[in-house]
From Swiss-Prot:
Source organism (scientific name): Loxosceles gaucho (Spider)
Tissue occurrence: Expressed by the venom gland.
The protein, known as: Dermonecrotic toxin LgSicTox-LOXN6
Keywords linked to the UniProt accession: Cytolysis, Dermonecrotic toxin, Hemolysis, Lipid degradation, Lipid metabolism, Lyase, Magnesium, Metal-binding, Secreted, Toxin
Phylogenetic lineage: Eukaryota, Metazoa, Ecdysozoa, Arthropoda, Chelicerata
Primary role: Dermonecrotic toxins cleave the phosphodiester linkage between the phosphate and headgroup of certain phospholipids (sphingolipid and lysolipid substrates), forming an alcohol (often choline) and a cyclic phosphate. This toxin acts on sphingomyelin (SM). It may also act on ceramide phosphoethanolamine (CPE), lysophosphatidylcholine (LPC) and lysophosphatidylethanolamine (LPE), but not on lysophosphatidylserine (LPS), and lysophosphatidylglycerol (LPG). It acts by transphosphatidylation, releasing exclusively cyclic phosphate products as second products.
Reactions accelerated catalytically: an N-(acyl)-sphingosylphosphocholine = an N-(acyl)-sphingosyl-1,3-cyclic phosphate + choline; an N-(acyl)-sphingosylphosphoethanolamine = an N-(acyl)-sphingosyl-1,3-cyclic phosphate + ethanolamine; a 1-acyl-sn-glycero-3-phosphocholine = a 1-acyl-sn-glycero-2,3-cyclic phosphate + choline; a 1-acyl-sn-glycero-3-phosphoethanolamine = a 1-acyl-sn-glycero-2,3-cyclic phosphate + ethanolamine
Length: 7
């Protein structure tokens, strides 16, 4: 889960 990097 990478909330900083939403693609």
């Amino acid at each position: 889960d990478d909330k900083r990097r939403q693609i």
